[in-house]
Amino acid sequence: MKKTFEQFRKSNLLFQVLKGPQHLECQKLFVLDSSFNPPHLAHFQLLSQTIKNFKLKDTRSHVLLLLAVNNADKLPKPASFPTRLEMMCLFADYLQEKLPQSVVSVGLTVFSKFIDKDKILHEQFVKGCSADIGYLVGFDTIARIFDEKYYHPLKISDVMESFMSGSQLYCLARGDCHLSAESQLRYASDILEGKFEPVIPREWGARIHVMQNDYPALRNVSSSEIRNKLKNGQVESLKDELPLCIYDYLINNKTIFD
């Protein structure tokens, strides 16, 4: 995987699919945008619940695991990009087994901003299909997307209009967020009621979906928490937070987070 990553890094490519179908094969695309450092069961739960609740009826869904490597010239910490890609490919096989009504691809992009990711996906992955794209993220990411300090002196409503008019955002409420779970679950309805205008247009609330986690035990699972447990020797507890394939990979490669 190191060679594959180096080839991408040295190329002029903006996006590349490394595993799975090279182009969209379904009417609904779910993009799991994460650091995959490592992939875990909370990622799976987000995908599973989103597909269950929002996939188009009687159709298959296409899942894209997308890793942004915009800082590829800097040594990533605490796991290298090739290592993350190996785990993403293992996770893709796990998803294909657990979500048989979906197809799964693994991709790289140089872009970190969602408006840029969305543009390149439409150009090179969706390729003119009238597909609905949903981005699966953490609530903290949604909060950053709509934080006006990242857009000053421009307005969020101007910068993000094209993205929000054609995309959906999905996440699960978390227990370790700066907002209570209740506030997270109300976030979209608060936008619809105009509580964030003029910064966030009220109509965008219909395109944001914050769900209650069906498995409370996974509510606080995060990649950083897993890395800390691994460093502290709390290996057994990780069995409840990781797919078996990722757990085995980490046990056999304990130094990747050093």
From Swiss-Prot:
GO cellular component: cytoplasm; nucleus
Organism: Saccharomyces cerevisiae (strain ATCC 204508 / S288c)
Principal place of residence: cytoplasm
Family listed: Belongs to the eukaryotic NMN adenylyltransferase family. POF1 subfamily.
Pfam families: CTP_transf_like
Entry's Gene Ontology BP terms: ERAD pathway; invasive growth in response to glucose limitation; NAD biosynthetic process; pseudohyphal growth
Record: residues binding ATP: H43, S224, E225, I226, R227
Keywords, sorted A to Z: ATP-binding, Cytoplasm, NAD, Nucleotide-binding, Nucleotidyltransferase, Nucleus, Pyridine nucleotide biosynthesis, Transferase
Uppermost EC category: transferase
Stated name of the protein: Nicotinamide mononucleotide adenylyltransferase
Induction remark: Expression is slightly induced in late log phase.
Additional notes on this entry: Present with 830 molecules/cell in log phase SD medium.
Subunit structure: Interacts with KSS1. Interacts with UBC7.
Catalytic activity from the UniProt record: beta-nicotinamide D-ribonucleotide + ATP + H(+) = diphosphate + NAD(+)
Enzyme Commission number(s) of this protein: 2.7.7.1
Gene3D superfamilies in the cross-refs: HUPs (3.40.50.620)
Residue numbers binding NAD(+): S35, F36, G138, D140, R174
Function as written in the Swiss-Prot or TrEMBL entry: Catalyzes the formation of NAD(+) from nicotinamide mononucleotide (NMN) and ATP. Involved in the salvage pathway for NAD(+) biosynthesis via NMN. Involved in the filamentation pathway. Suppresses the filamentation defect of a KSS1 deletion.
pH-activity profile: Optimum pH is 10.
